Amino acid sequence: MNIFNQLKQDIIVASKQLYNNQAIANTATIDIPKDSFNGDLSSNVAMIIAAKESIAPREVALKFKEVLITLPYIASIEIAGPGFINFTIKADSWQASIKDILQHEEKFFEIDIDKSRNINIEYVSANPTGPMHIGHARGAVYGDVLARILQKVSYSVTKEYYVNDAGSQINDLVSTVLLRYKEALGEQITIPAGLYPGEYLIPLGQILAKEYGNKLLTMNYDERFKIIKSFAVEKMLDLNRKDLADLGIKHDIFFSEQSLHDKGEIEETVKLLESMGLIYEGTLPAPKGKIHEEWDNRVQKLFKSTKYGDSQDRPIEKADGSWSYFASDLAYAKDKIERGANHLIYVLGADHSGYVKRIEAIVKALGKEQVKVDVKICQLVNFVENGVPVKMSKRLGSFASVQDVNNEVGKDIIRFMMLTRQNDKPLDFDLVKVKEQSRENPIFYVQYAHVRTISILSKARELMPESYNNFESGKYDLSLLSSEEEIEIIKLLVSWTKTLEASAKYFEPHRIAFYLINLASKFHSMWNFGKENSEYRFVIESNKELTLARLALASAIQKVIASGLEVIGVEPMNKM
């Protein structure tokens, strides 16, 4: 029995019995109180029902208490504050949870959540102009782990990468590759400022020279541009795919911006919005701080973005008459919705924080308020090595790429460390710290806890084979896990599903990293206490019954840590 799930179901049943309203009760929360004197679990159901029924919350809470106190796993119920219902759970119910984790793991960790949501999550979407730098890693890991979490709680999820292959930076890429091609043919070249001087484009020039000789130089501009662009973009995408794969990240779809232009999808989207009365010709006010004479006050086609909460309407055409990047965004959102997505999630870098309102406006308009949209911003990573910041710029030709850092510390460290702060807070990534074997290094601390649980089970198998066989057969008395420390860690184990659910609900993967660090800390404390007090050790040869119970506890800890690490795409270590 998962106590969180069971209590939620019993509250819903009680709500139907008392107020014939189980739908509202389903929105109630069940949380772990910050202060232990408020019980083990707390619910706000009384206040939700009271608001609907126009009754005093404490009166509602008292009625719930009368019904719920009869449940076999409830020790006591107290009403607190404006109407919170605080529950104390019987110790044997907590203890029994260990057996459920070990014998019914899949069912125990099952989360009953709305499965009608079809989520499209777009993340990374780095310009295909070179190797991915470490600044992209945070959004890549955040988006990938969030997608894994959403899939874990049974949502349908499409992981998408938007390939920006129609902008000015692609033109710069083509110009640079053309120069590298000429260089491969023996010409002396200079890479002008604004292009890409990195050596990673030299092989592309060599490949083109080998395949075409000097034929590209005899072609007209458009023909040559098309060949080099197609070749260079695909090679850079291959590079990005490999960088992502080495981080354990695989997208379902790589969607080309250029395809929106080629298939006329932008024109279709504009016509649709015109039919909805959302496109008009007008002028925009000058940006703050601009001298009026410097502002191009031309009449242009605008999307009524302000109707949906944006700060200003958005132009869909550039001064030369070509479609704006915003027009591509409109068509891209329409394409996602037409493919069946009813919830769009965009993961953007800190430099795109100004895009939040305009993206929300796009989806609200095209989704006709029926499609959900969330835009999540990942703040900067302060990447340092021995306290010295690493410069990150493709244009400078020397930067810390994802591959550089992956080669240095490995994907698991990168993935875990990118989750050690909330996504909208800056993150310090220190290469020295992440390789330390100390409690100050969170990934080591969590992995070491997993290794120690494996060690406990191995030691018991070696020293007490008969007892270990009994443990594997489920012959253990969990009532022996009665110390305050043991009950507290059992409560934490049971709350794993709650953490996973909250991570999915609030789009906060860092909650899982925080949970694992907390669980590892409590486990290490128990381990260290046993080193000083032999009666608290996990394996006690003179006390087989207690050893069996603690083997069950150690095994449950191992399973939960492994489950948490697997959700965030980190491989649990069995030895160090």
Curated annotation (Swiss-Prot):
Keywords attached to this entry: Aminoacyl-tRNA synthetase, ATP-binding, Cytoplasm, Ligase, Nucleotide-binding, Protein biosynthesis
Q: Does the keyword Chaperone apply?
A: no
Q: Does the keyword Phosphoprotein apply?
A: no
Which compartment or compartments is the protein found in? Cytoplasm
Task: Name the EC number(s).
Answer: 6.1.1.19
Segments carrying motif 'HIGH' region: 126-136
Name the InterPro entries for this protein.
aa-tRNA-synth_I_CS, Arg-tRNA-ligase, Arg-tRNA-synth_N, Arg-tRNA-synth_N_sf, ArgRS_core, DALR_anticod-bd, Rossmann-like_a/b/a_fold, tRNAsynth_Ia_anticodon-bd
Name the Gene Ontology molecular function terms of this record.
arginine-tRNA ligase activity; ATP binding
Q: Which reaction does it catalyse?
A: tRNA(Arg) + L-arginine + ATP = L-arginyl-tRNA(Arg) + AMP + diphosphate
- A single GO cellular-component term on record: cytoplasm
Provide a GO biological process annotation: arginyl-tRNA aminoacylation
The main place the protein resides is cytoplasm
Q: Name one Pfam family in it.
A: Arg_tRNA_synt_N
**PANTHER family found in the cross-reference section:** ARGININE--TRNA LIGASE, CYTOPLASMIC, ARGINYL-TRNA SYNTHETASE
NCBIfam families for the chain: argS
Self-association and partners: Monomer.
Which HAMAP family does the UniProt record give? Arg_tRNA_synth (MF_00123)
The UniProt family comment states: Belongs to the class-I aminoacyl-tRNA synthetase family.
This one is known as Arginine--tRNA ligase
Which organism is this protein's natural source? Rickettsia rickettsii (strain Sheila Smith)
